[in-house]
A protein has these predicted regions:
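Acidic/histidine-enriched, glycine/proline-rich intrinsically disordered or flexible terminal extensions
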Residues: 223-249
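Acidic carboxylate-rich catalytic motifs and surrounding loops in phosphoryl-/glycosyl-chemistry enzymes
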Residues: 54, 221-224
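A generic membrane alpha-helix/interface feature
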Residues: 65, 197, 231-233
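Short, solvent-exposed turn/loop segments enriched in Gly/Ser/Thr/Pro and often Arg
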Residues: 30, 177, 223-226
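GST-like fold's C-terminal all-alpha helical module
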Residues: 108, 112-219
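GST-like domain detector, emphasizing the conserved glutathione-binding G-site
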Residues: 3, 9-144, 148, 237, ...
């Protein structure tokens, strides 16, 4: 009998089953290291093909003109087979989890994985904007808010990791979609304070495990570097430093 932290399929089996049907996927977002990171890590992990496009390139006009035409005026949007548009980052991640073999088969385990995922989503604000767009005094203000609150959250995340006897992920030796979201947020936190994870060996072990996943390792090595955080944040794309944000540079 399976425990609630076990899955009847091995990671390779789940990935191969999930990716046997390959829809056309286009992920539309901005020049930010934020809500599109987990989806891209998951797709790279599964070896799936997708296109990542800036909003202004996909829609052919500035976001300020396109926003009213997009569902709820929000990005990211995942376009499936040129027709179906999925918005809300959580909905995108859960859909992709079924395609990438990172959604548990067991309903109870699925609920527990989703609980961890939702907990990571609570780190989005102020973390994502603080790293990506805030500058000057505004950056310092929101950085202080995050650094004051995050240690308590991190302690709880570490405790959840330590409940897994098999590790190194939240629910054993296999990564689920919650693990990719946790990695993204933890890695952003280290941009604000490099040693912020160091008090918890379980978290450091988790980070190393995600970074060495096939596909993810290559993605992390090739994705745009973020620089000048807090002063004039930019992503280096094809060797060119481009300001972060919702506008084409």
């Amino acid at each position: 009998m399976l425990r609630a932290d076990q899955d009847q399929y091995e990671p390779k089996d789940r990935k191969e089953r999930a990716m046997s049907e390959k829809p056309k996927l286009e992920l539309i977002y901005f020049n930010l290291r934020a809500l599109a990171e987990s989806p891209q890590m998951m797709m790279r992990y599964a070896g799936g093909e997708y296109r990542y496009e800036m909003a202004w390139d996909y829609y052919g006009k500035p976001w300020s003109e396109t926003k009213l035409e997009v569902a709820f005026g929000q990005l990211p949007v995942l376009v499936v087979n040129d027709t179906v548009h999925i918005w809300q980052s959580g909905a995108i991640v859960r859909y992709l989890a079924k395609l990438t073999g990172t959604m548990p088969e067991d309903p109870l385990l699925e609920a527990r994985v989703d609980a961890v995922f939702e907990q990571t989503q609570e780190l989005c604000a102020p973390l994502n904007p603080t790293v990506n767009v805030k500058i000057g005094d505004d950056h310092l203000k929101f950085k202080a808010i995050f650094l004051n609150s995050f240690p308590g959250s991190l302690k709880n995340f570490a405790r959840q990791l330590e409940l897994s006897d098999e590790g190194p992920y939240f629910f054993g030796s296999k990564p689920y979609y919650c693990d990719f979201s946790a990695y993204h947020h933890f890695s952003l936190a280290t941009i604000l304070q490099q040693d912020i994870l160091n008090a918890y060996p379980s978290v450091l072990n988790f980070m190393a495990a995600v970074e060495n996943l096939s596909g993810v390792k290559e993605y992390l090595a090739s994705r745009p570097e973020i620089i000048d955080v807090g002063t004039a944040p930019k992503l280096i794309i094809d060797g060119i430093a481009k300001p972060t944000g919702t506008k084409s540079s």
